[in-house]
Curated annotation (Swiss-Prot):
SUPFAM superfamilies: PDZ domain-like. It comes from Thermotoga maritima (strain ATCC 43589 / DSM 3109 / JCM 10099 / NBRC 100826 / MSB8). The chain crosses the membrane at residues 93-115, 401-420, 427-449, 474-496. It comes from the Bacteria. Its EC number is 3.4.24.-. This is Putative zinc metalloprotease TM_0890. Belongs to the peptidase M50B family. It is a multi-pass membrane protein. It is found in: Cell inner membrane. Its cofactor is Zn(2+). GO terms for molecular function: metal ion binding; metalloendopeptidase activity. One of its GO terms (biological process) is proteolysis. The lineage of its organism: Bacteria, Thermotogati, Thermotogota, Thermotogae, Thermotogales. It holds the Pfam family Peptidase_M50.
């Protein structure tokens, strides 16, 4: 079924894009020979008065083939007038621009019913650090951050970027359905050390005083995979340092954001006919750890990936948090209605639950606009954010190629598969993001892409000199070869990620 979803979505997205080219070509009386979805051999075709409409085997793109577009000679004068290169540069510019424009506009139109029906996801506050600027300003667990410095908080990165400036920020939060403004000033927090100790002995308490007798505790990172003795103000801890991560000092306000909620979305079966957890059950404790929200689930997952003799430690100045790993049978306390129930399950089984999509409820809150006007405003701003983020990601990719930032057709299939398990809203959102991204991607000034053809039209409009169509088509052909190689490379990376390579 996922494959069907994937093909339908990709076909629809491509069709909208190519429809832009087709309609503008017809508007300027350019003869369209073929309107094709996909590449390769045709599955079927329908012959119109002038145009053959084709559905091809590989749904990875599409094209509108116009008369004379490939630089071929046209003997008939009447037919020649209908050819692509017989039209002025400004008309060719608009025909080429129409594809990306239709893609982007389709994304904007799709976001409106999403916003009207489901609202928009906004960052929720999962934890407030005691004594932090957030607590002092009155922020509470469960508050929703609507905007920061007049920027709608479509993503937590928007909040983080504003906070990292270190300047006072203006927050608009939603509490009990009502908006409220708060002003607070970020505070510089010291660097954080996060590390894992194997064969750990002892209990840490207070500030870290020395590492293997050295009072310069920053040397800890030099002892990965070595035995260390850590002196704390309230005790000594020994073990093998297996992992170490240093987070630099940074401005913060003292909050963490919500993610998954510790509530089961469906019945969980240990084996056929024997359920362990029921839909609606809330995890409240696992062994010695209270579970209230997303951050607790993150720590729990870390503990479940480690053995009992392993310790996770997080140090920030004089603040310390530590947990021992969990293995074997673990005690899970759940709330089911008014009842509190204890269950013993294997750590590996609980870990598998946390790893499996769509078993736990989403804890990310949604804000539904009060009226259609606000819905239009929010949907337009959401699309603007997607547009700018896509453009920024492409710019960063070409400046500093990082293969983990990009996905191809196989990767998109995985994204659509995950969205289909979540619900219609997630699927429509993915479609809107894909179609906007397709529009932006096609505007890149690369041969074979619409952006490359737009550049040729602009140059002609400025210089009033037409490049030989055959030369232009050779350039686009070479660009197409490059894009196909890039496509195959990205597909290889997608498959590698799926196989864990």
């Amino acid at each position: 079924m996922v494959i069907v979803y994937f093909i339908l979505i990709l076909t629809g997205v491509i069709m909208v894009h190519e429809l832009g080219h087709y309609l503008f070509a017809r508007l300027f009386k350019v003869k369209v020979l073929e309107f094709a979805i996909g590449f390769g051999p045709k599955i079927f075709s329908v012959k119109g008065r002038e145009t053959t409409f084709r559905l091809n085997v590989f749904p990875i793109g599409g094209y509108v083939r116009m008369l004379g577009e490939e630089g071929e000679e046209i003997a008939d004068e009447e037919e020649k007038e209908k050819s692509f290169y017989a039209k002025p540069a400004w008309q060719r510019f608009l025909i080429t621009l129409a594809g990306p424009l239709f893609s982007i506009l389709a994304g904007y139109l799709l976001f409106l019913p999403i916003t009207l029906n489901w609202g928009i996801a906004l960052p929720g506050i999962d934890e407030v650090v005691p004594g932090s600027p957030a607590e002092e300003a009155g922020l509470r667990r469960g508050d929703i951050i609507y905007s920061i410095n007049d920027k709608i908080a479509f993503d937590t990165s928007i909040i983080s970027n504003e906070i990292q400036k270190g300047l006072p920020v203006e927050l608009v939060i939603i509490r009990n359905g009502e908006k409220k403004s708060l002003r607070l000033t970020p505070r510089m927090y010291p660097e954080t050390y996060e590390f894992v100790l194997e064969s750990a002995e002892g209990t840490p308490s207070g500030k870290l005083v020395s590492v293997n007798g050295n009072r310069d505790t920053s040397v800890l990172k030099e002892f990965v995979n070595e035995y260390v003795v850590l002196e704390f103000e309230g005790g000594t801890v020994k073990g093998i340092l297996k992992q170490f991560n240093e987070i630099p000092a940074r401005y913060m306000i003292g909050i963490s954001f919500s993610g998954l909620a510790p509530v089961f979305k469906k019945d969980i079966y240990f084996k056929e006919g024997l359920f362990v957890f029921k839909k609606g059950d809330r995890i409240v404790r696992v062994e010695d750890q209270e579970i209230e929200g997303w951050q607790d689930l993150v720590v729990l997952y870390q503990r479940l990936t480690l053995g009992k003799d392993t310790m996770i430690v997080s140090l920030q100045g004089e603040n310390i948090e530590w947990w021992r790993g969990l293995s074997g049978s673990v005690r899970v306390v759940i709330k089911r209605g008014d009842s509190t129930i204890e269950k013993n399950v294997e750590a590996s089984f609980l870990k598998n639950i946390l790893e499996t999509p769509d078993l736990l409820e989403m804890g990310v809150p949604r804000y539904k606009p009060k009226n259609p006007l606000e819905a239009v405003n929010l949907s337009v701003k959401a699309c603007n954010y997607v547009l700018l983020t896509t453009a920024s990601s492409l710019k960063n990719f070409f400046r500093n190629v990082q293969t983990g930032q990009i996905v191809g057709v196989v990767g998109l299939a995985g994204v659509i598969s995950a969205a289909s398990k979540t619900g219609l809203e997630a699927v429509l959102t993915v479609v809107a993001v894909i179609t906007i991204s397709l529009g932006v991607l096609n505007l890149l000034p690369l041969p074979a892409l619409d952006g490359g053809r737009i550049i040729f039209s602009l140059v002609e409009m400025i210089t009033r000199k037409k490049l030989n169509p055959q030369v232009e088509n050779i350039i686009h052909f070479l660009g197409f070869i490059f894009l196909m190689i890039l496509f195959l490379y990205i597909t290889f990376l997608d498959i590698g990620r799926m196989m864990g390579i």
